[in-house]
Amino acid sequence: MFAKGKGSAVPSDGQAREKLALYVYEYLLHVGAQKSAQTFLSEIRWEKNITLGEPPGFLHSWWCVFWDLYCAAPERRDTCEHSSEAKAFHDYSAAAAPSPVLGNIPPNDGMPGGPIPPGFFQGPPGSQPSPHAQPPPHNPNSMMGPHSQPPGAVPGTQPLLPNSMDPTRQQGHPNMGGPMQRMNPPRGMGPMGPGPQNYGSGMRPPPNSLGPGMPGINMGPGAGRPWPNPSSANSIPYSSSSPGTYVGPPGGGGPPGTPIMPSPADSTNSSDNIYTMINPVPPAGSRSNFPMGPGSDGPMGGMGGMEPHHMNGSLGSGDIDGLPKNSPNNISGISNPPGTPRDDGELGGNFLHSFQNDNYSPSMTMSV
């Protein structure tokens, strides 16, 4: 409260009494009580020189300020006269005082620090992400919306989410976004768990998200006219204008889920970048059953157990039914003979999103 420099001593009670006596004497002189002032000095035995200040004196001024504030207190302002300045002083002091409930809590302490726990902003069960890490989408313009893109549109404008994730489309099967309610697992496959991972445009699934023998998939926006079909009889026509959408051969020497063909994005104009499924999966004797749920092999771990199929242009099984038709993000052209791809479908960012179920029969299988 007081400075403790080398040339200044700490004020003591004696100094405070001297100051008060000086101010009393000064007050008596300013109010005209000169005899009382001299008597006061003689009675206290004052021996020092006194220097008077300007009237009305410090004691009088100090008292007036104190009294004004005292009368302006909330409990006395209605009965005592006071100035507006004194009232404003009390009101401002009450507003600036900390709340007795909160105390002196610093700002930004209303929320606990640290990262947000998992599931804090958890959505419905059908929209839960895969436990596997995935890269961020490469196309910031891909937003959720109606899948009404015409053929020949600019790649990169295909919405990232399938029909099951689109709130504007409620018809058909909830497909890959949630549990497979109407899709029986094909032969050689275990029960389907909560939805396999959906990969958006330009995104690759992690290697451990595909089961053994599953071809590597590099999904692209896939909205345009079909690519020409090669003369090889081992292929299935796909419709896509996106370099970067292809299905490589399964089990081609690399780890499961590793794309075998080089990314068509590196040579977009090459005639070699025909997106085909080159070879079937291994024979039934070497297959293993993998449950199609979020297990150790990822959400699509059971795809390696699919039956070989005939190359008559139909990719399907007798155990699959009830899937929506003519939906974007579908594999199209699979119900046509090789070399005659269709123009009315699109290959989107979701493998096995839904099948064209107009020209298949339970007896159709695909093999080489």
Curated annotation (Swiss-Prot):
Keywords: DNA-binding, Nucleus, Transcription, Transcription regulation. Residues 265-276, 353-368 have a biased composition (Polar residues). Residues 126-139, 252-262 have a biased composition (Pro residues). Signal peptide: none annotated. InterPro entries: LisH, SSDP_DNA-bd. Expressed in embryonic fibroblasts and chondrocytes. This is Single-stranded DNA-binding protein 3. Residues 100-368 are annotated as: Disordered. Residues 295-305 have a biased composition (Gly residues). It is found in: Nucleus. Residues 16-48 form the LisH domain. Disulfide bonds: none annotated. One of its GO terms (cellular component) is nucleus. Its main location: nucleus. Residues 174-189, 211-220, 230-248, 326-337 have a biased composition (Low complexity). GO terms for biological process: positive regulation of transcription by RNA polymerase II. May be involved in transcription regulation of the alpha 2(I) collagen gene where it binds to the single-stranded polypyrimidine sequences in the promoter region. One of its GO terms (molecular function) is single-stranded DNA binding. The lineage of its organism: Eukaryota, Metazoa, Chordata, Craniata, Vertebrata.
